[in-house]
Amino acid sequence: MANCAIVGINWGDEGKGRMVDYLTGQYDVVVRYQGGGNAGHTVINDRGKFALHLLPSGVFRPGVMNILGNGVALDCENLVTEMETIRSAGVGISPENLLVSHRASLLLPWHRELDALEEARLKDKMYGSTKQGIAPFYSDKYQKKTIQAGELLYPAHLKAHLQDLLERKNLILQRVYGAKGYTMEELIAWLETYAAQVRPYVADTGRWLRQAQAAGKSIMFEGQLGALRDLDYGIYPYTTSSNTIAAYAPIGAGLPTAKIDQVVGVVKAYSSCVGEGPFTCEWFGADADKLREAGAEYGAKTGRPRRVGPIDLVATRYGVEVQGATNIALTKLDILSYMDEVPVCAAYEIDGRITREFPFPAVLEKAKPVMEYRPGWCCDISAVRTWEDMPQAARDYVEYVEQAIGCHIGYVSVGAERESLIVR
């Protein structure tokens, strides 16, 4: 069976959760391969509206195995809370449909505290962190200063390892930031409250995935955030601290030999962004407020108002290229229905020169948008269910974007519900 990756093409918040929720009926396994509790995937179904920060979006589909891979920042506190929320809606969560890689590293209480302390230290130079501990976590992971989930199964080893980490981390907290630090008793209490509830789900998911692959099962890799937030290929340093691109999915999932047959890139019909950094086509004032309200553009995790503007075709084409997208899902087309004409950022002007190539981050700060305008359709399209019934101006807009980014748009969403998706 074919494997698929669902990834963001832009800054994140493109609507990946609804696409995973829609497509999971075709797959046996859904794997999260990077990131932690710092971003949310919104899913709307007959049970309600859910913002999933760690759980794979396949949890709502009976018979689908959901896996948190070794590349994930395993935030036990957020995960336990999320599982309780899902269960309260009548969704079963057990090791029969959720597994956690024994090689996933734990995001510990001090990671979140260090994140907030560093943002406070940076003041007006902050990166716009969600303060969920992601950067300190990945920093520790690459310094080999974390606890792996598999260690939860070996309490004596875990306690000794934690004691070593505690001494070093308290030196940083106390001497660099002037913070209080932690005691061993506090950490043990945290482990007993949260990590103990995750322990039953810990397994050798790499072996499980290899067996699933050998048995011909189909696997979906669910990405978090978008290409422009990738640590290596994004707008550095205003990125996340992991690799969000599809090429990393097999590694972070725990199945490095996997072949990805299809990469579905998710693109919003306009631009939105949470956090700091260059955002070339940003709107301000009344125009921004109207688009933000129309699209309900507030962070799923933080609730922060998102920065918004017209679709950025330069950034989107770059995202398509680095993600290796083979198909595009264009979301929230219905939000643009109030516009008489739809603006698009077709190119950048940098130092008096026009370019359609996405520049190096230091140069991006100088970019100015070169705008074009497409006819609006000025009618509600949220009830449209076939491409043929779409207003001609809306179809023209989709085809214009498709040609500009160089990738087929196979899905167009006109609402948040499962059925509000048009397949081309």
Regions flagged by a language model, labelled:
Residues M1-R424:
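Non-transmembrane, aqueous-exposed alpha-helical and coiled segments at domain scale
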